[in-house]
């Protein structure tokens, strides 16, 4: 051969795998095996060198002066034969089959035998299964077996999903110390202190005799000064547990003083006046009717931390009278009117994408709808009412993103377009709207368990094109059109008492206005004031019962879709 060729190390990608396959075949045929592991009277032939190479437990057993060093049989205690079989398969194949059924046996066994790969696989599997109903149990399980990363992941999950977590049995069964640790954490993500207070009361009521004495100790970690005066007087003052405890009353009086004597607030600063660290939520505004008197496709995002607006990719079809919701880090844009016809089509943007992503189509609704109401409950999207170009609808349908399918549900009692749809305490409320003849003040609610609609107390004012949102256990209805005037008035519905109260009006009349809650405040977005479309945004703080203006959007619009979601 001509020339000088430099030596080169060549590595094949199949060598290690080939050796493992060969050793596994030898194990299964009991060839060259020099030890037998005995578990629950079942024998597992194996090779010491393979076990020692994979497990520090076996390495110590076979290389130290332990009694098992030279024995042909080794009894393994503390695990089942079926688990031993899974672990040996991993040792010889690098593959482990983790399931919901076996993980609670597999992880402790992997810890016992010091099989790091199996332990890691089990932890990753459990992290993928985290849910509000199981995260507290997984956290304890991880702590027991010193799985630090899994323990931290479960802890963060429980903080992020606190309002859902406290609805499940695992929370109710916590010890007092565990409840204290959770509720005093700055990182639990709640829009207000209401779910924290209600979680404490729920925990105490579960075992009243044993837990009633713990209430003052727990209540000191509830940041009651950050609750609204209305909630303090309507809910906390009427709670029998509070009224019977002098220590609890002192904490309530502190909260009242915080509101009644604002000049003393600087002297009252402490753990109970420090807000929880909320997730960085952002506001999305999609489509609508622009200043050029036509539907638009513009999407803007508002970040309350920076108080800045930015543009996201445009939707694929220009739409006004559009509804928008967020679900599992995805934004859905539903129905609307493109200037020619009402739409049944739905677009989706995956907000977890590395880049800004692209909009893509999902299954269309069964009915074409403009000015429909939309909301989410659980893992589903609900859409009701709307106008198809010829008639207003009473129908409601539900979208399941897991199967990309819409299904029809029970009809409302009244056909409505321009109505608001919102969920409170697991019930869907539809508010106001226009039936083709009259602007409505009627309100009906849908129970997903029974599939039936029922009327509740009507609003004080007839409204179509109002914005609706849930904040601190009250449904707020902002602006709209009453048939004569474009409204700046706002009213709030107390779902506990089935009653309405008027709250401070916005500074600007707004019809076809969007409304959503962000970081414990109510945002009224854009709309039409009777003369022109708006780009301005008002922000309502329920604690001080007043509005403030935030940075305006770059685009004037009404009839837009509005939603909030956690920043990626």
Curated annotation (Swiss-Prot):
Quote the gene name from the UniProt entry: KLHL12
Q: What species is given as this protein's source?
A: Bos taurus (Bovine)
Domain BACK, residue spans: 135-236
**PTM comment for this protein?**
Ubiquitinated by the SCF(FBXL17) complex, leading to its degradation by the proteasome: ubiquitination by the SCF(FBXL17) complex takes place when aberrant BTB domain dimers are formed.
Q: Where in the cell is it found?
A: Cytoplasmic vesicle, COPII-coated vesicle
An example Gene Ontology biological process:
protein monoubiquitination
Q: Which GO terms describe its molecular function?
A: ubiquitin-like ligase-substrate adaptor activity
The entry's cellular-component GO terms read: COPII vesicle coat; COPII-coated ER to Golgi transport vesicle; Cul3-RING ubiquitin ligase complex; cytoplasm
What is the recorded name of this protein? Kelch-like protein 12
Annotated metabolic or biological route of this protein? Protein modification; protein ubiquitination
Q: Name one Pfam family in it.
A: Kelch_1
- Could you describe the subunit structure of this protein? Component of the BCR(KLHL12) E3 ubiquitin ligase complex, at least composed of CUL3 and KLHL12 and RBX1. This complex interacts with DVL3 upon activation of the Wnt signaling pathway by WNT3A. Interacts with DRD4, KLHL2 and SEC31A. Interacts with PEF1 and PDCD6/ALG-2; interaction takes place in response to cytosolic calcium increase and leads to bridge together the BCR(KLHL12) complex and SEC31 (SEC31A or SEC31B).
In the record's own words, the domains note is: The BTB domain is required for interaction with CUL3.
